[in-house]
């Protein structure tokens, strides 16, 4: 049988899809492109925004149109959070939540015997571990991504992720160290640590991200350890001092802000003020000037006034960030913010997104100009294409050795 996969949303989903692909291949299935005719289509859904829901449904419709006789399986975060909504779609044959994603192949084979529509979703908050760590390794070319943690213990008022991914579960430190050593032996120079909320790594184990990093930097052969998104209130002084002083830790940090208005930050239950956020950003940039700081911003949060938005704009304009991801607010199931009123009209949200996207382009250009004339470490990710330690993607002739870490003049 032929099986095709479509992955929506974050890298967590990409990890999970790769795990599923391997299981299907081992069972003798032929994995084909989502654009091809297949007997089974697996859509790994996203629900972080209304747009994620919409894109997930569109993928489901596309699959059934491509082959009306195919079995369509909806899994992932949308399936976990709102399974009955997906089950109502005539195009969907199976709904499998994140709790049972690792058993999807077995559930599918049971379906093949009975051909009865089924919803298989468990209680996400009962999940106690990250499953199948040995295969939770995803590659973007020569850059391996390790999922070291899953879930989030912080229930921000706008965010559905804890309901989709559960509470914090961390991979044992020894397993991660072993995996990174294997990657070093294979010649990889950079490794990316990722998770739902990386700064919560180890909370369920009695240790933390600092502990993990102090072990990983000892591994010979790995020259760059890149970190995914972190929350500034989960970064203690030990961790901050380490990331600005240790050369092996890539000077590229994604620190979600969400709003530059203290009133909105409080409504979001983010746990910090813009002044506290600025203090962390300034500490990093002052102590490691080449650092790239990325962030996330939500516009149009319920009750956000023009004054709130202007505070956000002026704050982002002032602080030394290098790029931002901008999202229009959308109500999510189970969240406190979904009950907040008044809601902002779509046209206002779109306009605020547009304004911040213009600022984002200026920030990216400013960061590039700031780095001109500097010699930086960079990984050759494709022939004549490099990614610098501080996340500048550049094209330069004469670099043929893919996977090699070099020094390059910007």
Curated annotation (Swiss-Prot):
PANTHER family recorded: RADICAL SAM PROTEINS (PTHR11918), THREONYLCARBAMOYLADENOSINE TRNA METHYLTHIOTRANSFERASE (PTHR11918:SF45)
Keywords: 4Fe-4S, Cytoplasm, Iron, Iron-sulfur, Metal-binding, S-adenosyl-L-methionine, Transferase, tRNA processing
Homology family: Belongs to the methylthiotransferase family. MtaB subfamily.
Protein name (record): Threonylcarbamoyladenosine tRNA methylthiotransferase MtaB
Binding residues annotated for [4Fe-4S] cluster 1, in chain numbering: 10, 46, 77
Listed SMART domains: Elp3
Subcellular location field: Cytoplasm
Catalytic reaction list: N(6)-L-threonylcarbamoyladenosine(37) in tRNA + (sulfur carrier)-SH + AH2 + 2 S-adenosyl-L-methionine = 2-methylsulfanyl-N(6)-L-threonylcarbamoyladenosine(37) in tRNA + (sulfur carrier)-H + 5'-deoxyadenosine + L-methionine + A + S-adenosyl-L-homocysteine + 2 H(+)
Cofactor binding description: Binds 2 [4Fe-4S] clusters. One cluster is coordinated with 3 cysteines and an exchangeable S-adenosyl-L-methionine.
Pfam families named among the record's database cross-references: Radical_SAM, UPF0004
Positions of [4Fe-4S] cluster 2 binding: 152, 156, 159
This enzyme's EC code(s): 2.8.4.5
Domain of life: Bacteria
Provenance organism: Aquifex aeolicus (strain VF5)
Cofactor(s) needed by this chain: [4Fe-4S] cluster
